[in-house]
Every structure is written in C-alpha cells, then in structure tokens.
Regions:
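Amphipathic/hydrophobic helical signal segments and adjacent flexible N-terminal regions
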Residues: 30-86, 92-101, 164, 171-172, ...
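Tryptophan (W) side chains
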Residues: 8-10
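Helix-adjacent hinge/juxtasegments
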Residues: 96-134
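Acidic, glycine-rich flexible loop segments
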Residues: 126-127, 144-164
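Short hydrophobic alpha-helical segments enriched in small aliphatic residues
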Residues: 12-18
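Short hydrophobic/aromatic-rich beta-strand segments that constitute the beta-sheet cores
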Residues: 59, 87-91, 117-121, 143-148, ...
C-alpha cells in the first residue's frame, strides 16, 4: 500500500471528485424511511394500481358484536412501500374520550396480479389473519374484498373462525368494514370506519 501511494499528491480535481461522490451518497441516504427502512422511490409495477392506498389516514369508527357492548374509536392507518411487490400496513386505535390505546395491528398487503391480492395481519391479541381477495382500481379509487383463508391463534387468544374485510377508497377518503365469526357466534358485522388522507 505504501509503495502504491508513494508520490501521490492530493489536488483540486481529486477534491471536486470526492465532493461529487459524497453528494451522491447523501442523496441516496436522504430517502424517506418506513419504520427505519429506506424507501425506494419507485412503486413496484404490480402494486401501481393500488397506489391510491399509500399514505397516512386518520378518522373514526365504531364497533359492535353480539358478545360485547358497542364502542367507538379514533384511528390511524398507514400504507407504505419499499419498492417490492407488497405494501406495509399498520393500524392503531384510541379511545376518543380519554386517548387510551385500544386495538393495533400490523401486516403486509401482497399484490399478486391485476386482480388478486393477499394480506397477512398480526394482532397483539394473539391472532393472525391470512386473507385472500380481489380488487378493482383506477387512478384515484379502489375496492378490495378479502376473505380469510386461515385464522391462527395463540393458546390464550380468543377463538376467531373467519374474517372478511372490505376496503373502499375514493377522493382521499377510505371506508372499511370488518365482519367475523368469533367466540362461537355466526358471521356478523363488527367494525366500520371512515378515514381521510392526511399525508402521502
């Protein structure tokens, strides 16, 4: 190494080149992040029809079921991407009166082709939903229908047999409905909410 470097002198041209390289690295690492992961600038081609989902959504919803009292909640949903053929999904809700945390879940929306989607959602209640479905979309709207193909539960989780989810989006407004068969009850409506996009 010393022999290779002998006689080398730093000059203005080298300095300019070094600054150009540094600028390129800074530009690369200034990309936005999702949960600490740098986000690719381009959405994966197969995900582009569902690009209207991307962003931060906030609003309110309500829930009911035959085994519990009716309730209300405020909610934040985030769909984001890292340039691969899926969207990352996170959701959290709070009590609208005292702000205490309620439900939360995280998962991935996997786009299979121009009609089919899959989704996996994990919940801190010990439940994991595996869903499959279909979608229709245009430049600013989409509808997605999911049905569970499997619901996995930890040993202490409440029993859930089946789940359906419907997501509708148009004009920066997202509406969804969730139905389920749980705790020995037949399939029935459980949740609905209306959210507005607050950031892309």
């Amino acid at each position: 190494m010393r022999a290779a470097c002998r006689g080398w002198r730093w000059n203005a041209s080298d300095a300019r080149h070094g600054l150009l390289v540094a600028d390129k690295f800074r530009a690369l690492y200034k990309r936005p992040t999702v949960l600490g992961v740098r986000v690719a600038q381009q959405i994966h081609e197969v995900c582009r029809p569902l690009a209207p989902l991307l962003g931060i959504w906030r609003g309110s919803g309500s829930g009911h079921y035959s085994t519990i009292n009716d309730f209300a909640y405020v909610e934040e949903v985030v769909f984001d991407h890292v340039g691969k053929p899926f969207f990352a999904y996170s959701q959290k809700t709070k009590n609208p009166i005292n702000g205490q945390p309620l439900h939360a879940e995280r998962g991935y929306l996997r786009v299979i082709n121009d009609r089919e989607v899959e989704m996996v959602i994990a919940q801190p209640t010990g439940i994991v939903e595996i869903l499959a479905g279909y979608y229709a979309a245009n430049s600013d709207a989409c509808v997605i229908n999911f049905e569970s193909t499997e619901v996995a539960m930890t040993a202490t989780a409440k029993t859930v047999a089946e789940v359906t989810r419907v997501i509708r989006l148009e004009n920066n407004e997202m509406l969804y409905d969730v139905s389920m068969a749980a705790m020995g009850q037949s399939m029935q409506h459980h949740l609905s909410a209306t959210l507005q996009r607050v950031a892309k």
